[in-house]
Amino acid sequence: MHPLRFNLTNSHNPIRKNRRVPTRRTCIIFTEGETEEGYFKKFKSRCKTVKGGSMLKIVEEAIVQKKNLMRNYDQYWLVVDKDRTSPEHFMFAIQMAEMNGIQVAFSCDSFEIWWLFHFSTINSRVNPMDYEGTIKKYVHDYSFRDKGILQGAKMWLALHSRLDSAISNARKAHSQCKTTNEAYYQSVTTVYQLVDFLNKQRPF
């Protein structure tokens, strides 16, 4: 008895013909800190830490690094904290980044608010000093003082099962802001936009 043979290269094969493999879009992420870098590397993303001090300086450095890259990417992102940046400087920095082809995932006040959205929606301003107590209810060994690539990777491992909730909660808080001027946002992050994009690029 002869073994069955299947010609997988035949154009008449319906399985082969109808199968579509989505193309992953390439992306590079400039991050203000190493914690963010460690977190986003868990999405198998290319990351580069940007040093600059003020938000405007960070944007300027990201633009320089983008121009010095050896290859092109489909998307360029910058992850940055608003911190104490004035509304005028904040909007100027955002506009400068976008004019140079860099999308900005910003957090008001700091990136760690993204951790909070994994557990609940935030409807009012949360003092960054209160982040730790809330997060420790779910990640018991968490410390706000722990920073760095390993800390970012650790938080990804601890929280990635709640990713859909975090995206939904952060999107809801963003959409409910009473002003359309992002410079006056409080306890909001647009990191969910970047994470949503990366999550859709992951192979399953």
Segments from the language model and where they lie:
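C-terminal accessory helical subdomains adjacent to catalytic cores in phosphodiester-
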Residues: 2-8, 13-24, 37-50, 68-75, ...
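Hydrophobic "anchor" residues on beta-strands that sit immediately upstream
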Residues: 28, 77
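Helix N-cap/beta->alpha junction signal
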Residues: 32-33
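A short, well-structured beta->alpha microelement
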Residues: 51-67
